[in-house]
From Swiss-Prot:
Organism classification: Bacteria, Pseudomonadati, Pseudomonadota, Alphaproteobacteria, Rickettsiales
Organism: Ehrlichia ruminantium (strain Welgevonden)
A single GO cellular-component term on record: cytoplasm
Location within or outside the cell: Cytoplasm
Group of enzyme by EC: transferase
One example GO MF annotation: rRNA (uridine-2'-O-)-methyltransferase activity
InterPro entries: RNA_methyltr_RlmE, RNA_MeTrfase_FtsJ_dom, SAM-dependent_MTases_sf
Annotated catalysed reactions: uridine(2552) in 23S rRNA + S-adenosyl-L-methionine = 2'-O-methyluridine(2552) in 23S rRNA + S-adenosyl-L-homocysteine + H(+)
Protein name: Ribosomal RNA large subunit methyltransferase E
EC number: 2.1.1.166
Function description: Specifically methylates the uridine in position 2552 of 23S rRNA at the 2'-O position of the ribose in the fully assembled 50S ribosomal subunit.
Gene3D superfamilies named in the record: Vaccinia Virus protein VP39 (3.40.50.150)
Family in the record: Belongs to the class I-like SAM-binding methyltransferase superfamily. RNA methyltransferase RlmE family.
């Protein structure tokens, strides 16, 4: 895990998210946010299929958090790797948001499968799937 410089009006949480979802629930309770941004990435093992499955797992956890804590019409951004489970995850995000688009930063290597899903217009009152 890497530290990050503070940003005004931003709540930055550095933790192993797999073990902290209940902590987030108790910390933020009924608080809602305009944006949920996940730049999480697992430690790469070098096997593209395993690395992809691991990041999709993190993406699913970040989506679960977004669905719980985001305001209506809110924004969700998450890092993703292209691969076998990408389309299924995309469909899950699309269920909860009006617009979902891929974004590849200019700083990202051209041969990298890393990109971001930028999701706008959170649809309130849908159950997490």
């Amino acid at each position: 895990m890497q530290e990050m410089s503070s940003i005004p009006n931003v709540i930055f949480i550095l933790c192993d998210i797999a073990n902290k979802i209940e902590l987030l629930n108790s910390t933020f309770d009924k608080k809602k946010f305009d944006v949920v941004l996940s730049d999480m990435a697992p430690k790469a093992c070098g096997n593209k299929q395993v690395d992809h499955a691991n990041i999709i797992n993190l993406c699913e956890m970040s989506l679960e958090i977004a669905v719980k804590f985001i305001k209506p019409n809110g924004i969700f951004i998450t890092k993703i790797l292209q691969g076998e489970y990408e389309k299924e995850f995309y469909q899950s995000v699309k269920y909860h948001f009006n617009s979902v688009k891929y974004f590849k930063p200019k700083a990202s290597r051209k041969d990298s499968s890393e990109m971001y899903l930028v999701s706008l217009g959170f649809k309130e009152n849908l159950e997490y799937i």
